[in-house]
Design a protein with these regions (language model features):
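Nucleic acid-binding interface residues in structured DNA/RNA-binding domains
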Residues: 2-123
Length: 123
């Protein structure tokens, strides 16, 4: 993978990493992914990156409330892929109570160290 250098590269890599954390059989929203990556309000950037591909599990990303935002054949393909993963729907929306992936919340008082990866309390 390319070495991350500027702010745009860091943003892209963090968003891609968040998308890749969504497990088989779970979904997340564009906004939740942006927040998990540390960029609240960047939901459109998430959509743009999915469009660029990067070999991401694009089918696991839905709109708020579980709505498939794609249209036409792409929407049909997304639903079929999700159903193949065991994801259930309520009408046109993913059953978010069952299938929403919750990203771990970062504690405001902790940081990750580069060497150990463990969280340390900051006072």
């Amino acid at each position: 993978m390319k070495k991350v250098s500027g702010p745009e590269d860091r943003m892209r890599e963090k968003i891609i990493a968040a998308i890749r954390r969504i497990p088989h059989g779970k979904v997340s929203t564009y906004g939740a992914i942006a927040r998990a990556a540390g960029f609240p309000g960047a939901a459109r950037r998430v959509a743009w990156l999915l469009h660029r591909s990067y070999g991401l599990p694009w089918q696991r990303v839905v709109g708020s409330g579980g709505e498939i935002k794609l249209r036409g054949d792409s929407a049909i393909e997304q639903r079929l892929r999700l159903e193949a993963e065991g994801v259930t729907f309520r009408g046109r929306r993913v059953n978010m109570k069952r299938h929403e992936f919750k990203f771990a919340k970062k504690s405001a008082g902790s940081i990750r160290t580069r060497q150990s990866g463990r969280a340390k309390r900051v006072r």
